[in-house]
Amino acid sequence: MSDLLPLATYSLNVEPYTPVPAIDVTMPITVRITMAALNPEAIDEENKPSTLRIIKRNPDFEDDDFLGGDFDEDEIDEESSEEEEEEKTQKKKKSKGKKAESESEDDEEDDDEDDEFQESVLLTLSPEAQYQQSLDLTITPEEEVQFIVTGSYAISLSGNYVKHPFDTPMGVEGEDEDEDADIYDSEDYDLTPDEDEIIGDDMDDLDDEEEEEVRIEEVQEEDEEDNDGEEEQEEEEEEEQKEEVKPEPKKSKKEKKRKHEEKEEEKKAKKVKKVEFKKDLEEGPTKPKSKKEQDKHKPKSKVLEGGIVIEDRTIGDGPQAKRGARVGMRYIGKLKNGKVFDKNTSGKPFAFKLGRGEVIKGWDIGVAGMSVGGERRIIIPAPYAYGKQALPGIPANSELTFDVKLVSMKN
């Protein structure tokens, strides 16, 4: 019986002369009965010892046997003809036949019942001799078993519901529910975007709007330039016509050539100015920063105790956070692969006393020196985070990255 795993406690109270099924139909689980105990309170004044019997349906019994087996039509016809011939003789022996027939029918019914059910005595208990008896009886749901007690005392059976290798698997629905719960509790997806993603999308939208404005201004400037060019050409043609109408004094060829060259130079100068203006417009209102300026504005990294790396993104105002100060923080915590495992971006800020061991050691070291309004990235090696300890969403030996902002401080 070592393969039968106990699942729950089993108990059954069998009152005298009342058959009780061993297994309830609502719980079709194999039971193992290990003890039978006598109830010392008698139901009558006879005080007879109680005998526990087990009644089991015969697995080899079939309804066809109960009904008389298979029938053959030819045999039925022959029997009917024989019955007609013997009908007269049966009438003569009517009085004697009825009595014998009733006795034979009762005997047949008793025999049929005996064939259908098997009854065995398990034990007999008495308050004068023996109160209890140990058993080792295993009953499966497929067996139709009942208990009955004869005597003056009830008998209580106890044992365990057990897991039998041939039982129908239980808890299929529960397993499906557990799978659904795992799906909903799993952290393979994140419905809320990171703040960095939101800020990046907003900046992209602003860049797109600026590009559209620049393009619109370029188109307008080009239209204005075309209109200006057409107006200048019309003015030049009118001036030339006027000059042709007016009587001019005779000029030398050198003077005409010089004037023509001056006009050409003026046209070229105008075109150069327009091209330069358009070029500046395309480049934007500010000149591109040099590498030195870009490096100057790039956040500088510092390596602190235990290899903790900090990058100040925004320098706050006021005094710096020191040991013992109560600080309120906003933060986003990420694993090395960028997956967010925890964050506080709204509601009540996360507050703790700096340097008092209320948070992981990496925070006590990394937050020190910040001012209110300051933003910082803290990269914490595993020994200064949770080390070998695995938490929900955080594997063991994980390097953690926190983007933090100091929103309040009280010394």
Swiss-Prot record:
Chain spans, region Disordered: 54-127, 160-302
Annotated ranges, domain PPIase FKBP-type: 324-411
Feature: compositional bias, Basic residues: 251-260
Pfam families associated with the record: FKBP_C (PF00254), NPL (PF17800)
Chain positions with Phosphoserine modification: S80, S81, S186
Residues where Phosphothreonine is found: T89
Biased composition (Basic and acidic residues): 261-296
Function: Proline isomerase that belongs to an abundant class of enzymes that catalyze the cis-trans isomerization of X-Pro peptide bonds and can accelerate the refolding of proline-containing polypeptides. Specifically binds nuclear localization sequences. May be involved in the assembly or folding of ribosomal proteins.
Protein name listed in UniProt: Peptidyl-prolyl cis-trans isomerase
Annotated source species: Saccharomyces cerevisiae (strain ATCC 204508 / S288c) (Baker's yeast)
Taxonomic classification: Eukaryota, Fungi, Dikarya, Ascomycota, Saccharomycotina
